[in-house]
C-alpha cells in the first residue's frame, strides 16, 4: 500500500469585518454602528494524491509570511509524518515566533482523521465527550447595555450562569486603570463568586508590578480561580511572576505568549506559573499542544487551552489535566468575533448560546476536525490566494 503524498497547498487570505465591534489593537470591544476591518486570517487546504484534503481555517493573524516559508517543504511529503514537519518547521522558523506551524499542523491532523475515518480526539486516545466551559468576555466598552460598568459585567456573569456556564472570565478595559479593574473584580465576585469559578485576564496592560499586585490582592479577596497575564512584559518574565506568585494566593496562569513546549517547561521549573496556557494555533498545532499537555502532566500541572475552536476541543478531549473550555470572546450584544459563525456550515458553533444546560460543549464526532468549513463564504471575504505545488 503506497503512502499518501501532498500534491498542492492552497492558502486563502481573508478578512471578515467586525460588526458593532472595534479594536484598539490590544482587545476587541462593543461599539454600536462600528464596522472595522477584522484581522487578515487564513484558510488552509492541503491536497493529496488520495483525493482527501486537510483543511483548517485559522483565526490567528500574522502567520502568512511564516507559512510561506514552510509550505513548500511539505510538497511531495507524507501528510501523516507530522513530527517531521514539526521538527523541520521549528528549524526553518528559528528566528521567528513559530506561530506559522500551528495552522499547518492542524490541517495535517484534519487529513489524518479523514484518512482513517476517525475524529482527531480518537487518534489522540481521547475519551472526554463533554467539556466544561467558561464564558470569556470581550473587553470593557463605553456603550450602555454592553460591558460599560462593573455592574454590567456582573449582569452578564449572571446571564452566563443561567445559560449553564461554570465559570466567567473578565477582560476589563485596556487602559490600565487599576481601580476600575478592581471594581469589576469586586462586583462580579460579590454577585456570583459563590456560584461560579471566576478568572480575570488584563491582557498584559499593567505598567508596574505594584499595579499587578493590587489587582492580584483583589482577586484574593474574591477567591478567583486564576489571574492571567497582568503585566506589560507580555507574560515572559519568569522572575517577576515567581515574585507575584509568592505575594498572592490566587493561582497565576501564564504561557500564551511563550510558544512551544520548551519555554513552558522552563517556566514551570522557574516556578513562575500555577497553570499552563496553550493554544493549537500558537504552540505548534495539535502536535505541539499535546507536547505541552504531557509536559505539564509530568509536573502535576493543569493546562488551560486558549480561546474556542474545534482543534481546542479535540485536544482537551484527550487531556486529563484541563479544567475548562474557553468560550470566547462573548458579549451580551454581539456574536463571538474570535470564532465567527461565517466560517462554518452545519451545527458547529462557538457562540454564547452554544452550550448545554450541563455547562458543557460537545466534541465533534466527524472525521478529522469534524466540522464543515464554509469555503464559499471565505472566498467571499478573500483578499488574496496563494498556491504551492
Which residues are covered by each model-predicted region?
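Metal-dependent enolase-superfamily TIM-barrel catalytic cores that perform enediolate-based chemistry
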Residues: 130-248
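Flexible C-terminal active-site loop/helix
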Residues: 4-7, 11-14, 18-21, 33-39, ...
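Shared catalytic-loop signature of beta/alpha-barrel
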Residues: 24, 81, 217, 223, ...
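Conserved, mostly hydrophobic/aromatic
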Residues: 6, 51, 70, 104, ...
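Ligand-binding pocket scaffold of soluble enzyme catalytic domains
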Residues: 40, 49-53, 115-118, 123, ...
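Metal- or metallocofactor-binding catalytic centers and their adjacent structured scaffolds
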Residues: 8, 47-116
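Non-catalytic terminal accessory/regulatory regions of metabolic enzymes
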Residues: 1-53, 61, 102, 158
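Glycine-rich, aromatic-flanked loop segments that form ligand/cofactor-binding clefts
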Residues: 105-145
Amino acid at each position: 500500500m503506497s503512502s499518501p503524498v501532498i500534491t498542492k497547498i492552497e492558502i486563502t487570505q481573508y478578512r471578515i469585518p467586525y460588526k458593532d465591534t472595534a479594536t484598539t489593537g490590544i482587545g476587541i470591544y462593543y461599539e454600536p454602528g462600528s464596522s472595522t476591518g477584522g484581522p487578515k486570517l487564513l484558510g488552509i487546504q492541503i491536497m493529496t494524491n488520495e483525493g482527501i484534503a486537510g483543511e483548517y481555517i485559522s483565526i490567528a493573524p500574522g502567520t502568512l509570511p511564516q507559512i510561506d516559508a514552510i509550505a513548500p517543504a511539505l510538497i511531495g511529503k507524507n501528510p501523516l509524518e507530522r513530527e517531521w514537519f514539526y521538527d523541520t518547521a521549528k528549524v526553518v522558523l528559528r528566528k521567528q515566533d513559530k506561530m506559522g506551524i500551528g495552522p499547518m499542523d492542524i490541517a495535517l491532523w484534519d487529513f489524518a482523521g479523514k484518512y482513517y475515518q476517525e475524529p482527531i480526539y480518537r487518534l489522540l486516545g481521547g475519551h472526554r465527550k463533554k467539556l466544561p466551559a467558561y464564558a470569556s468576555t470581550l473587553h470593557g466598552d463605553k456603550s450602555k447595555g454592553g460591558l460599560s460598568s462593573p455592574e454590567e459585567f456582573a449582569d452578564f456573569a449572571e446571564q452566563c450562569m443561567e445559560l449553564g456556564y461554570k465559570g466567567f472570565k473578565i477582560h476589563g478595559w485596556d487602559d490600565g486603570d487599576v481601580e476600575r479593574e478592581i471594581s469589576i473584580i469586586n462586583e462580579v465576585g460579590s454577585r456570583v463568586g459563590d456560584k461560579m469559578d471566576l478568572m480575570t485576564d488584563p491582557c498584559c496592560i499593567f505598567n508596574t508590578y505594584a499595579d499587578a499586585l493590587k489587582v492580584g490582592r483583589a482577586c484574593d479577596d474574591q477567591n478567583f480561580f486564576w489571574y492571567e497575564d497582568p503585566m506589560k512584559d507580555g507574560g515572559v518574565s519568569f522572575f517577576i511572576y515567581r515574585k507575584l506568585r509568592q505575594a498572592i494566593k490566587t493561582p497565576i496562569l501564564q504561557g500564551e505568549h511563550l510558544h512551544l513546549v520548551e519555554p513552558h517547561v522552563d517556566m514551570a521549573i522557574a516556578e513562575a506559573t500555577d497553570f499552563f496556557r496553550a493554544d493549537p494555533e500558537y504552540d505548534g498545532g495539535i502536535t505541539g499542544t499535546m507536547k505541552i499537555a504531557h509536559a505539564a502532566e509530568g509536573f502535576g500541572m493543569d493546562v488551560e487551552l486558549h480561546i474556542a475552536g474545534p482543534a481546542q476541543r479535540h485536544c482537551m478531549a484527550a487531556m486529563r489535566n484541563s479544567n475548562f473550555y474557553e468560550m470566547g470572546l462573548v458579549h451580551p450584544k454581539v456574536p463571538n468575533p474570535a470564532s465567527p459563525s461565517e466560517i462554518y456550515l452545519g451545527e458547529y458553533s462557538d457562540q454564547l448560546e452554544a452550550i448545554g444546560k450541563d455547562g458543557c460543549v460537545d466534541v465533534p464526532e466527524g472525521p478529522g476536525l469534524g466540522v464543515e468549513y464554509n469555503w464559499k463564504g471565505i472566498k467571499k471575504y478573500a483578499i488574496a490566494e496563494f498556491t504551492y505545488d
